[in-house]
Structures are given as structure tokens and as C-alpha cells.
A protein has these predicted regions:
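Carbohydrate transferase catalytic cores enriched for Leloir-type hexosyltransferases
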Residues: 1-149
Length: 149
């Protein structure tokens, strides 16, 4: 199975909990026996994986909304993981693989005033769209499990 993992947010960022989670997930995936394709921005700071894809330096808005989804479509993985930031909104068009975002918390819903511009207008809409999809799936599965009792 071909699995891509978005590690583009690692470039130029301080390593906090979400970044460390993404690195740990990536390293665990390497032991899975699957073809793992890490996607980096500017450089691979983690290892010498020959399957790594490096997106050249660009504006973060352009990277997260156009270049990343174009790169993923070109790779055509069966699964793509987003362990740090949500997937680009346009990824749903023309991509046949499965998309798995990571929800670290929902503080962005309650504390919107504390968010910077990028978080308000990039993260929040993307996370809400993904969360809405996941909630529909969860409710459907919950109802299905209740009906089978």
C-alpha cells in the first residue's frame, strides 16, 4: 500500500507536541512494510528516505492550498495522512485515495479570538469541514451499532 504523510509544516517551525507526534507517526509507518512517501517543504530534515518528495520553497498559503494537493494527486497514494494541519480543501476534487486528518483538539472553536489570521482563515474552515464529515460517519456508525443490538 502506498501511504503519503504530509510533513510540510515541519519546515521552519519550532518542534512542539504536534510536530513530535507527526515525526513519531512517520517513523512508526516506516516499520509497517508499506511504501511510505513523506512530503516535505524545502528539505527533508528527518532522514534520507529515497521516496521523500520535497516541495520547493514557496509562500505558505500557496503551499497549503495549491502545491500540496497538486503534489498528492501526482503521487496518487492509497492513503494520505495529515498529522499536523488539516488537508487542503481542494484535495477532495480529483483525488481517489483516503484522507486521514488528525484532530489534536477543538480549542479553536471556543477560543477563536486567540487565533492568528492563518488559523482563523485556513485552519478553522478546514478543520470544521473535516470534523463535520467525521461526525456524520461517527453518528452513522453509532446508529448502526445500536440497531444491531
Amino acid at each position: 500500500m502506498k501511504i503519503a504523510i504530509d510533513l510540510t509544516p515541519l519546515y521552519g517551525r519550532k518542534r512542539t507536541g504536534v510536530e513530535m507526534y507527526a515525526i513519531d507517526l512517520y517513523r512508526a509507518l516506516l516499520t509497517s512494510g508499506n511504501l511510505i512517501i513523506p512530503i516535505f517543504h524545502v528539505q527533508n530534515e528527518l532522514d534520507d528516505n529515497p521516496n521523500a518528495v520535497i516541495i520547493p520553497e514557496s509562500n505558505r498559503l500557496l503551499l497549503e492550498n495549491i502545491k500540496l494537493s497538486k503534489c498528492i494527486r501526482k503521487i496518487a497514494p492509497d492513503i494520505v495522512l495529515f498529522p499536523i494541519f488539516p488537508p487542503p480543501v481542494d484535495l477532495k476534487w480529483g483525488f481517489k485515495g483516503k484522507v486521514y486528518p488528525t484532530f489534536h483538539d477543538c480549542a479553536f472553536l471556543k477560543y477563536r479570538k486567540t487565533l492568528n489570521f492563518a488559523a482563523k482563515y485556513y485552519l478553522t474552515p478546514n478543520l470544521l469541514a473535516e470534523l463535520k464529515k467525521r461526525l456524520k460517519i461517527s453518528i452513522f456508525l453509532w446508529r448502526k451499532s445500536c440497531a444491531s443490538r
